[in-house]
Amino acid sequence: MNEIKLRGLIRDIKPSHSIGDIEYNKANLIVSRDDGIEDVINLRFKKFSNSYKEDQEVELVGNVRSYSRQLDNGKNKVDIYVFTYFDKPTWDVPQYFEEHHDKLPNNELVVDGRICKIDELRTLSNGKKNIHFIIANNLVIGDGNQKLNSYLPCIAWGKAAADIAKLSVNSKITVYGKLQSREYRKKISDEEFEIRVAHEVFVKSFTTDD
């Protein structure tokens, strides 16, 4: 399972890459949270299936994937993005959103997999607890049943964090939440910092077979 439903403003539509004769585009989707904070979600999609324009409000369905690329310094960077099937949704997206527009959140995700990395439960100075972990999601795509493995960073807070801390590597888990972005400072040298954007799954609830 790996499905995300999003609503937001699409911006910065530009060419991404090609596979064979198929061209792909990329864009940013600006998704507002209830508190007014905006998440910037990376999108990928087939060029021919894109009928959207800059700053248009769109409603879409897709899945969350990871891609590891090598930087100029030789290090690897993992990008998290949403691949959306504008041309082949699993259900009638426009009709569904029209009928449920006022009931739907802007950002809803369900994804399952196995925990491949889990940190210790942390208690912050304000007393709140959180935990970071990564799940490996196996997605079957295309007519040839091609398998795609993605590694998705997750964060949970409060009781959910305390419960997840009881799990271990290889535990099977289904997460219900949303995809969010956050800025952080990366130290480049003793005097220089660079502002970067990370993406992670915010866990609202979860179930496990363990």
List each language-model region with its residue ranges:
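Single-stranded nucleic acid-binding surfaces, predominantly the OB-fold ssDNA-binding core
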Residues: 1-210
